[in-house]
Amino acid sequence: PGPDVKCVCCQDGEECPCKGGECCITGTCCKEGDGLCCGKCSNAACKCADGCKCGSGCSCTLGNCTC
């Protein structure tokens, strides 16, 4: 894996492609210059139920979800 390897990570319920692999564990890839957020969170590192607002009905199954 080179420096241009991408993985899909989640922050604030959004998917974002970014370089490296740690973001897939920490769920923080939407920092400035890191990547562009796009779409709903569906990656294994941070998976939330559809429409999750982090309330009583929130089901965040894996990772550091910040719905």
From Swiss-Prot:
GO molecular function, one term: metal ion binding
SUPFAM superfamilies: Metallothionein
Keyword field: Metal-binding, Metal-thiolate cluster
Keyword flag Cell inner membrane: no
Chain's role: Metallothioneins have a high content of cysteine residues that bind various heavy metals.
Family label: Belongs to the metallothionein superfamily. Type 4 family.
Protein name: Metallothionein-B
Species this protein is from: Sphaerechinus granularis (Purple sea urchin)
Lineage of producing organism: Eukaryota, Metazoa, Echinodermata, Eleutherozoa, Echinozoa
